[in-house]
Amino acid sequence: MNAEIIAVGSELLLGQIANTNAQFLSEKLAELGINVYFHTVVGDNAGRLEQAVRVAQARAELIIFTGGLGPTKDDLTKETIARLLGRELVIDEEALRSIEAYFARTNRTMTENNKKQALVLQGSTILKNEHGMAPGMAITLNSITYMLLPGPPKEMQPMFLKYGRPFLMEQLGRHERIESRVLRFFGIGESQLETDIEDLIDQQSNPTIAPLAGDGEVALRLTAKHHSEIEAKKLLDKAEQAILERVGRYFYGYNDETLFKKTVKMLKEKKKTIAAAESLTGGLFLTELTAIPGASQVVRGGVVCYANEVKEKVLHVPASVLTTDGAVSERCAQLLAENVRTLCHADIGISFTGVAGPDPLEGKPVGTVYIGISTPENETEVYALALPGQRDAIRIRTAKYGCSIILKKLAAAYEG
């Protein structure tokens, strides 16, 4: 099945909000084996929406709309689709009662235009809105399925997962299982990873292998279909094994796992604590770690040592090192890692120093990075990197490289 997603709302065209609904729906439809070939964004204009629908009808078997189901005059999705399909709009009594109950519960006066939110396409399947007022709806006519969903993500996402997805699975007449798995990699570019497994991607039709890139990471989505859930998972296992035989050294996790989540998880498993001295990253590393539930079990603390004075007075980096080697140097990174570990009584000390830009520093180019790792068992190691990108990209990639290094150290040094 081929699909098109039409997002309705002038605020999207004006760039006032991001179209996260299309991203969410594309991901979920891919898991169902539905091909999303087009994303369309239309402002609050009935004529242009009608034009977009006619284009979509010529190239898609499933058209999903987000937005335009509200009570105001510029909420015109239902009216436009009803006119195009020759369907009347009728009141859904359950939705109307829910809207009336909301206004009564909040002690507010319900204006007449709010009844508009209870209007649905005659003959459609109602998708309940358990997080808002306007229900969604779905209907199939002339071999095309139309699904109308609310615009707010907090309403749209749970509605689709609970009611929209089952509707589509029934429409597909699908008794086979669709299993999906995301493999996450760091330290390898998308082009290199794809080159390393190009023949696997070309040969695979079940499961399919789709590369995904973002924020200095690469992911592969594997999607398998089979009448048996067990057999579908076996197909995924076989494909995963073939991929990891080639690029396994860059692999770190599955699905929605992040490098920061994996780092906290492994520190817990190994019963190790960590402290950080952050110059280049300015606290970003510990901010990301401590956003993970349970991080308090493994994070001892840290120092944002942006100024050389702090490096010297708090973390005891000698002035001679800062003068001779520089703040952006292997020696400075080494001392920062060792001294923050001692200061915070942690098992592992990590340091970040470098040049994020936009200008060079101490004669070193933008993207120069040093990451120090100190443990009681081993001599402190310093990793020198040359990272591409703008300032923010360099900082987040540096923090992620720190996680990657820690994960490898934990796996190698603390087995068992």
Curated annotation (Swiss-Prot):
Transmembrane segments: none annotated. It comes from the Bacteria. SUPFAM superfamilies: CinA-like, Molybdenum cofactor biosynthesis proteins. CDD domains: cinA. InterPro entries: CinA, CinA-like_C, CinA_C, CinA_KH, Competence-induced_CinA, MoaB/Mog-like_dom_sf, MoaB/Mog_dom. Gene3D superfamilies: 3.30.70.2860, CinA-like (3.90.950.20), MoaB/Mog-like domain (3.40.980.10). PANTHER family: NICOTINAMIDE-NUCLEOTIDE AMIDOHYDROLASE PNCC, NMN AMIDOHYDROLASE-LIKE PROTEIN YFAY. Belongs to the CinA family. This is Putative competence-damage inducible protein.
